[in-house]
Amino acid sequence: MTSASTKVGEIFSAAGAAFTKLGELTMQLHPVADSSPAGAKWTETEIEMLRAAVKRFGDDLNHISCVIKERTVAQIKATVKRKVYEDSGIPLPADSPKKGPKKVASGVLSPPPTAPPPSSSSVPEAGGPPIKKQKADVTLSALNDSDANSDLVDIEGLGETPPTKKLNFDQA
């Protein structure tokens, strides 16, 4: 069995050959003035076949890119979710990893169904974990948001009172 890097190398070799062939076809499509034979002219059907082949190639690459991007985002979300559960001391739910956390109307994650009640003895001190849990909820909400760049939240210093700044508009 060949390694993944060997397979990728073979793919790029095949892509190089395909682009070489595309270059040759392009040169045939745009012949130099009088040096080409009369039969070298492309028909509309042949040009359309080439256009369709190049378009399919681009579409296929875009599809592959989307699949990889979705898988990568899902892996990042799963890793962050697992880290949040580990940091908060709550066991990771046993449900399918493909299911994302559910949002409630306020945009904050609902508590996991397998989480122990707050009054149980397995919950650590009341001072530390709630702050971590609050930060984790905001982070997961931002990651699960469909428009990832519109609602990014800076969670550093969350819970701290920011220093008050007064602006003096009376200065000339």
UniProtKB/Swiss-Prot annotation:
Keywords for the protein's UniProt record, in alphabetical order: Chromatin regulator, DNA-binding, Nucleus, Phosphoprotein
Compositional bias of kind Pro residues: 110-119
Gene Ontology cellular component list: MLL1 complex; NURF complex
Span list, region Disordered: 87-172
Keyword Hydrolase part of the UniProt annotation: no
Subcellular location as annotated: Nucleus
Name of the protein this chain belongs to: BPTF-associated chromatin complex component 1
